[in-house]
Amino acid sequence: MEFKLFDSELKVMDILWKEGDTSAKEIAEKLNEQVGWSKTTTYTVIKKCIDKGAVGRSEPGFICRALISRKEVQEAETNELIDKMYDGSSDKLIAALLGSKRLTAEEIQSLKKLVEKLK
């Protein structure tokens, strides 16, 4: 299952992933505080998420529920990045990430464990 969510839609999803089922009114209040969105803007973005199948709506109270997990979106976004920027090569992405920063001994050990798990 692949979803392309825009930054605005990810703001709505982030609330649902953190809070669980949440009313549209509460989402609008949170996003007004966080980024200054009006209620109308928030409801428009929620509608787009519903249309994409990322959010489910139940009544009464216009309760929103995430229908896709953060992990699914992370995987889809990562795969798109790999395809678009690294010619479909995961190892090129990893090399770019590792080449841009010095790793601590702990981070290196963690990466070794991850590689062993993938074998």
Which residues make up each language-model segment?
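Alpha-helical DNA-recognition elements
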Residues: 44, 48
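A short, conserved structural fragment
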Residues: 50-59
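Amphipathic alpha-helical dimerization/coiled-coil segments
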Residues: 79-119
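Short helix-to-turn junction characteristic of helix-turn-helix DNA-binding domains
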Residues: 16-20
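Short acidic, hydrophobic short linear motifs in intrinsically disordered regions
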Residues: 22-30
